[in-house]
Amino acid sequence: MKFPASVLASVFLFVAETTAALSLSSTYRSGGDRMWQALTLLFSLLPCALVQLTLFFVHRDLSRDRPLVLLLHLLQLGPLFRCFEVFCIYFQSGNNEEPYVSITKKRQMPKNGLSEEIEKEVGQAEGKLITHRSAFSRASVIQAFLGSAPQLTLQLYISVMQQDVTVGRSLLMTISLLSIVYGALRCNILAIKIKYDEYEVKVKPLAYVCIFLWRSFEIATRVVVLVLFTSVLKTWVVVIILINFFSFFLYPWILFWCSGSPFPENIEKALSRVGTTIVLCFLTLLYTGINMFCWSAVQLKIDSPDLISKSHNWYQLLVYYMIRFIENAILLLLWYLFKTDIYMYVCAPLLVLQLLIGYCTAILFMLVFYQFFHPCKKLFSSSVSEGFQRWLRCFCWACRQQKPCEPIGKEDLQSSRDRDETPSSSKTSPEPGQFLNAEDLCSA
């Protein structure tokens, strides 16, 4: 049975960020910054409440009589109680022999084109730990992108405008960045396990390191770009946020309406149609929050029973990073054109170059992960290197086709001029084979 390290990491980030945010908000209050205090508390307490609801919903405590658990969640102590419960189950699992076990069937990764199916016994204790890990993974994603990401953006914006970074603010920004990166990492792992549910997935440590570097560069660059743009064009940033929000929020619903599928009713039996709609809207909001800052790795599909698309779409990945890179470049250009005196001692061209290189570095680590460290890379129809080689061949072929056509066209023009200058009584004529070859080559 695996040690529940992911549960411990989720609880640590939750407690550390909440404590740092409450401490910093008291500092803002003593300094008279009421607006910064209110926003800091909002981005701290809102994800706390959502995390409590998530843990309560995943464990289905609504249908069970557990008043103490409900009270602890109302007091915002639910994650601590769940973590204590997880470690009690973990340390007691080896002492008691379980009379009832369930058997799960998983397929191994193909070796030499063959994939074997293996059976594994899962006891009640291990099943409970799996449920707890799943609940804390989802809670970490919610905390990261509905709380930590806005919190990091806010605190960095305050630091830029005040031209000062205090110890409390730097501590909160560091914890928030770690929380976002960890949430994005959990998104990648959840996406892999959902898409390849029938396989036994084992993620290697180097894969975790590669994902961590990929997400760190991507998220840090995105947050800095948004803060720089907000510091010079406060009104226009609202337009950028609304465009991003409605684009990602409406996209899954537009696909659902175009598919003509019936409204999903099998999310939770205890939920009514209104409750199902609220849950779907919340999932869409979370999906939007993730894509505002980084690639979600999970595509929301409302017409699917699992609500997740299990197909890996390279085209969507390519389009997302191309559009996001262009958007970041445009925002940095606008910041460079309208920057104020607070950036007097900042080398603006160098900063723009560093941010663009940082985003390209994130894309590089992403490609390295999918090429070398993805646990299910053997199931891909084509790898990253093969796709790049195909694109390079097409590009070289197009360049080769354009180069021969230009001089041949000049030779044809010169030969036609010579033919016009030749007297009509002359029997000399150009060979038709030359024109035929040129026309065939250019048409090809």
From Swiss-Prot:
GO terms for molecular function: protein-macromolecule adaptor activity. Residues 423-432 have a biased composition (Low complexity). Its main location: endoplasmic reticulum. It holds the Pfam family XK-related. The gene is XK. Keywords: Amino-acid transport, Disulfide bond, Endoplasmic reticulum, Membrane, Phosphoprotein, Transmembrane, Transmembrane helix, Transport. Residues 408-444 are annotated as: Disordered. The lineage of its organism: Eukaryota, Metazoa, Chordata, Craniata, Vertebrata. It is found in: Endoplasmic reticulum membrane. Recruits the lipid transfer protein VPS13A from lipid droplets to the endoplasmic reticulum (ER) membrane. Residues 408-422 have a biased composition (Basic and acidic residues). It comes from the Eukaryota. It comes from Pan troglodytes (Chimpanzee). The chain crosses the membrane at residues 3-23, 38-58, 69-89, 141-161, 172-192, 209-229, 236-256, 278-298, 318-338, 350-370. Heterodimer with Kell; disulfide-linked. Interacts with VPS13A. GO terms for biological process: amino acid transport. This is Endoplasmic reticulum membrane adapter protein XK. It is a multi-pass membrane protein. GO terms for cellular component: endoplasmic reticulum membrane; plasma membrane. Belongs to the XK family. Residues 24-37, 90-140, 193-208, 257-277, 339-349 are extracellular. The modification Phosphoserine is found at residue 115. Residues 1-2, 59-68, 162-171, 230-235, 299-317, 371-444 are cytoplasmic.
